[in-house]
Amino acid sequence: MTAEHVSRGDIFLVALNPTRGSEIRKTRPCVIVAPLTTGGHPYPFRVRCTFDGKDGHVVADQLRAVDRERLVKHLGRLSDTALNELLGVLQAMFAV
């Protein structure tokens, strides 16, 4: 899979630096919709998930548009259950 074939729910390693202020930093796995983290707290706009054997959260409160050049490597896909929960959180966030 190349960065040209990106689908909702795919997980890519994304180079997020440089950043400003409190933007999420580092090169980290990101769901194509929101970044993933194994740290942090379970805030209302974060969706618990397990990926690559690690428990973490989809950080839906840190949405960011990125250019395809920032996509380092395709890592896999978010589970259907976690993706559906994420889409529900996004609907609540944006009141759609």
PLM features per residue range, with description:
Residues M1-V96:
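Conserved functional hotspots at enzyme active or ligand-binding sites that engage polyanionic ligands
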